[in-house]
């Protein structure tokens, strides 16, 4: 299983709603939090941004950080 699919599966189990915008962009949302991920293929993250109450909060290129965000 590739990183993108694995992240989609684990986030769904934690109550996140995933929307695939296109072949490179996924948006996860739950409550007031929205996380936007941009991928290079299905295994390499280009970057991700987290928004809380529609305000930009942080940016990362680290998949481990994204996993931590999704554990909120």
Predicted features along the sequence, with ranges:
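Short, charged, intrinsically disordered terminal tails
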Residues: 67-72
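Amphipathic, interaction-prone secondary-structure segments
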Residues: 15-44
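Negatively charged, low-complexity tracts enriched in Asp/Glu with abundant Ser/Thr
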Residues: 1-22, 54-65
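Intrinsically disordered, low-complexity regulatory segments enriched in Ser/Thr/Pro
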Residues: 37-61
């Amino acid at each position: 299983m590739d990183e993108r699919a694995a992240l989609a599966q684990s986030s769904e189990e934690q109550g996140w709603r995933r929307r695939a915008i296109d072949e490179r962009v996924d948006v996860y949302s739950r409550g007031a939090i929205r996380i936007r991920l941009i991928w290079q293929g299905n295994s390499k993250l280009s970057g991700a941004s987290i928004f809380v109450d529609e305000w930009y909060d942080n940016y990362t290129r680290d998949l481990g950080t994204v996993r931590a965000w999704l554990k909120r």
